[in-house]
Amino acid sequence: MSSSLAGVRTRVRIPLAFADGYSTTAQAVTFDGLEDGREHVALILGDPDLGAATPLVRLHSECLTGDVFGSARCDCGPQLRESVERIAETGGVLLYLRQEGRDIGLYNKLDAYALQDDGLDTYQANTALGFDEDARDYTAAAQMLTALGVGELDLLTNNPDKVRQLTALGVTVRDTVPTGVHANPGNLRYLRAKAEHTGHTIRLVG
């Protein structure tokens, strides 16, 4: 279990409207006492009974370029859009984690992009800058789930490390539900690196 307890700070309902016309309503939840001190937020979608049901949960790391600007260098924006709708259909939680660039920060991520343009893959670029291949720690995510009363969940992810970390932190992952594969010419190298290097469950054609 996570090393300390966090508590719910605020709950507020937010209408969500996406550029493709999809809309829904989320309950945004903020927290006090998160171990890393960051302003992570949970979006509760579909009015689940979190204490009784096994909700569908997505851990989504912040990606300004993909989530906001629609960058085609990654699949983050389409994954976020897909996750909101799928979770709203079944009831569950999307944790929006402030971990830009696999937790190296925005400017460093853009530096890594420049190295990728010179031929490195996404993981090689991070290590060339002196960072871990993936610096993300999900202790705060486990704290958030505990504060929401979620002990068992189905995890919407292609990333086996999220399953490993949550399990080690005392969260029961009943099932792993893969996201779709959002490939385009701009992100094929990125997706292939994730599949080949870190075992993401991504099936690419060609």
Located regions from the model:
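Catalytic domains of riboflavin
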Residues: 1-206
